[in-house]
């Protein structure tokens, strides 16, 4: 399953041809692949950035932003719907916190970005946790998502190619340091 989901990028269980028809039907009846529904896609005039607007199963919406810079393909992913902080430079805080994203909803953004790029013959090189929300206020799910992104048999994003951007939540930074992950940390 992992190979089909992460490496081959299938979006339907029926495409997993090495599984029996009965198993594929059971999977289809009980699970979904990529719960994000793309409801918008906006490219900049220079075409070096594209913003994806996703609808979640509960109807809430989140954004991810894909950026091209030289050989780098960086995806900025959301960790919350809204945000409890009210940073002056960020519109998301005006929404307030609606809810935290699950690790699966965070990783789904990465899988979508990988599929989007692979259709163009490109690969995702970097992930930054700096979309909607304060990642350190959704610590457990963000940490789980980072570990899933980094699995060799998963999304296979190198740990040093993952950056967490925070508004400076000190207790979260301290807790993150205890995890001994070698991700990047950006404070904005």
What are these regions (language model features)?
Residues 2-73:
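Flexible, acidic/Gly-rich N-terminal and inter-domain linker regions that tether
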Residues 13, 35, 118, 184-185:
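Residue-level signal for secondary-structure boundary elements
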Residues 62-183:
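Conserved Radical SAM active-site core
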Residues 188:
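Extended basic-aromatic, gly/pro-enriched interface segments that bind polyanionic ligands
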């Amino acid at each position: 399953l992992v190979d089909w989901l992460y490496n081959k990028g299938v979006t339907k269980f029926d495409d997993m041809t090495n599984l029996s028809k009965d198993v594929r039907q059971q999977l289809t009846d009980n699970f979904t692949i990529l719960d994000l529904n793309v409801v918008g896609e906006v490219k900049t005039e220079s075409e070096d950035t594209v913003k994806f607007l996703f609808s979640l199963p509960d109807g809430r919406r989140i954004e991810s932003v894909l950026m091209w810079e030289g050989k780098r393909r960086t995806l900025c992913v959301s960790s919350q719907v809204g945000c409890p902080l009210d940073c002056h430079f960020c519109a998301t805080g005006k929404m307030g916190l609606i809810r935290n994203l699950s690790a699966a909803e965070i990783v789904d953004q990465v899988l979508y970005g990988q599929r989007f790029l692979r259709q163009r013959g490109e690969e995702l090189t970097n992930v930054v946790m700096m979309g909607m929300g304060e990642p350190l206020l959704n610590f457990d799910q963000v940490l789980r998502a980072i570990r899933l992104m980094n699995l060799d048999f998963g999304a296979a994003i190198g740990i040093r190619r993952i950056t967490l951007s925070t508004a400076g939540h000190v207790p979260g930074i301290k807790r993150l340091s205890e995890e001994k992950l070698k991700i990047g940390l950006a404070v904005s």
